[in-house]
Amino acid sequence: MSNCELTVLKPAEVKLSPRDREGIINPMYDCQPAGAQYAGIGIKDCIPLVHGGQGCTMFVRLLFAQHFKENFDVASTSLHEESAVFGGAKRVEEGVLVLARRYPNLRVIPIITTCSTEVIGDDIEGTINVCNRALATEFPERKIHLAPVHTPSLKGSHVTGYAECVKSVFKTISDAHGKGQPSGKLNVFPGWVNPGDVVLLKRYFKEMGVDANIYMDTEDFDSPMLPNKSIETHGRTTVEDIADSANALGTLALARYEGATTGDLLQKTFQVPNHLVNTPYGIKNTDDMLRKIAEVTGKEIPESLVKERGIALDALADLAHMFFANKKVAIFGHPDLVLGLAQFCLEV
């Protein structure tokens, strides 16, 4: 043995810094009716009817107006104490007839429930049957689709409310029209995205030569200021587009939690194949989407999009390390948005 001394190492010390604040403070967390209303305003000639108090409509419209800087039509049954005690079915019947009389081009009314109307147990499906008979008597030449949308705020969020409204509207309209001749089109459910995202998706499909219907088409929510601009802003998705979804070549759902259930409905009811990919944020998710489009439609990915991909990769290789090296990221948002952004963070 040498004269070396045995050194006993002290155990490592871990110091925890006190947290002065929470990671999330007062997060944006809206109720189901808010998401249902956003889905409804994405349809042309559609006015959502919220069966509840005025606040369930007023504050949501304010949220949309502040974000998009546009005006939107959303109606309310203005439920009060009497209806809360004795039932509010009559308010729905009155609201539907008032909308039909005031808007001659109206074709879709999603009837969106709230906490109060779900708790008191209003029979929305039965009320819709009464409304349909009244509409047939007063407006025999018109067809207005009434879709029941059950969105109590005591569960879920605006994300689940959006998905529920889309599914109910598609079920109501597609069941009324049935399946026709194959259209060769592609159904696309991008989920809760902004107008610029819809414009970009349309360009992708145009570059690939794919005829696609995007649900819900909110491109006009960022419409230019033109002389003939309407006071109210509406979506571009028409009743014919929704009815034609049953005849599509396939469905591409870009949001697992904001439209995929409607794709499942079309597959189960009309045998339209449903394909699910992540929302195309970042290189990998966009690659997956374009490959799936090519697989379903038989179209090739054009050189123009391959070049764009190369430019994006070059930018990441040149600059990403300068901004993202050794950085920590916190992501909070819609589930599909978080999945997409998390994948992008892994890429850089």
UniProtKB/Swiss-Prot annotation:
Tagged with keyword Cytoplasm: no
Keywords: ATP-binding, Iron, Iron-sulfur, Metal-binding, Nitrogen fixation, Nucleotide-binding, Oxidoreductase
GO biological process entries: nitrogen fixation
InterPro entries: ChlB/BchB/BchZ, Nase/OxRdtase_comp1, Nase_comp1_CS
Cofactor binding note from Swiss-Prot or TrEMBL: Binds 1 [8Fe-7S] cluster per heterodimer.
Enzyme class: oxidoreductase
Reported cofactor(s): [8Fe-7S] cluster
Subunit structure: Hexamer of two alpha, two beta, and two delta chains.
PANTHER family to which the protein is assigned, alphabetical: LIGHT-INDEPENDENT PROTOCHLOROPHYLLIDE REDUCTASE SUBUNIT B
UniProt-recorded name of the protein: Nitrogenase vanadium-iron protein beta chain
Lineage, opening ranks: Bacteria, Pseudomonadati, Pseudomonadota, Gammaproteobacteria, Pseudomonadales
